[in-house]
A protein has these predicted regions:
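Short, well-ordered amphipathic alpha-helical segments that serve as non-catalytic structural scaffolds
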Residues: 1-3, 37
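Active-site groove signature of glycoside hydrolases
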Residues: 3-26
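Beta/alpha (TIM)-barrel catalytic core signal, keyed to glycine-rich beta->alpha loops juxtaposed to Asp/Glu
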Residues: 19-195
Length: 195
């Protein structure tokens, strides 16, 4: 029914969304799980590539060990990378397994302070890097990684800012990379490795 509504005969990429816990992975990849259905759809020509998204490094690594996914959608973010060492191991495993690396949350900064207004970014459950210089450095950090693509934020103003930054993209210099690392110091990341 979805293929008919979209007037196509296949999906280029179909992803398991939001693998957060090992239980999520077990259910999706186990007998009669969603992954089994995705594989059958791929064999039938309805799906070309199978991917997944995760917000847990441990689950992402386990998923790539368990199945030969074509892509991963994962939060590659300068604060998480430097303050929580969250992301380098996932990027390395994805490169090793030749999995396309799609980044999200590149312009995320930290959790919202308690009782803080989320205005004007009501769609963001995290505090974004809304100041233009910081946003530019944050997105350029992610785009400077060995990724396939970065998904812009869904918040309209941030989306437009991301497009402007990407249009004039220059990889971060070694000095700028060091500066971004300093900008992350002491900032609470939105994701951490499991204890």
């Amino acid at each position: 029914d979805s293929l008919k509504k979209l007037r196509t005969d296949h999906f280029d990429l179909y992803q398991l969304h939001g693998l957060t816990t090992m239980d999520d992975l077990e259910k999706a990849a186990g007998p009669d799980g969603a992954l089994e259905t995705f594989v059958k759809a791929r064999e039938a020509g309805k799906i070309r590539h199978v991917g997944f998204s995760a917000h847990s490094a441990e689950v992402a690594l386990a998923a790539m060990d368990r199945f030969d996914f074509d892509s991963i959608l994962f939060p590659f973010n300068f604060v998480c990378w430097h303050e929580a060492q969250f992301g380098p191991q996932v990027l390395a495993k994805a490169k090793e397994k030749n999995v396309a690396r799609l980044a999200l949350k590149a312009m995320a900064y930290s959790p919202w302070p308690e009782n803080a207004s989320h205005e004007p970014y009501g769609k963001c459950w995290y505090q974004p890097t809304s100041q233009s210089q910081l946003a530019s450095k944050a997105l350029r950090f992610t785009l400077s990684l060995d990724i396939t693509a970065a998904i812009p934020p869904g918040e309209e103003a941030l989306f437009d800012m991301a497009l402007d930054i990407a249009e004039n993209f220059q990889p971060l210099s070694p000095e700028e990379l060091e500066g971004v690392k300093k900008l992350a110091q002491g900032v609470k990341p939105i994701f951490r490795l499991s204890a």
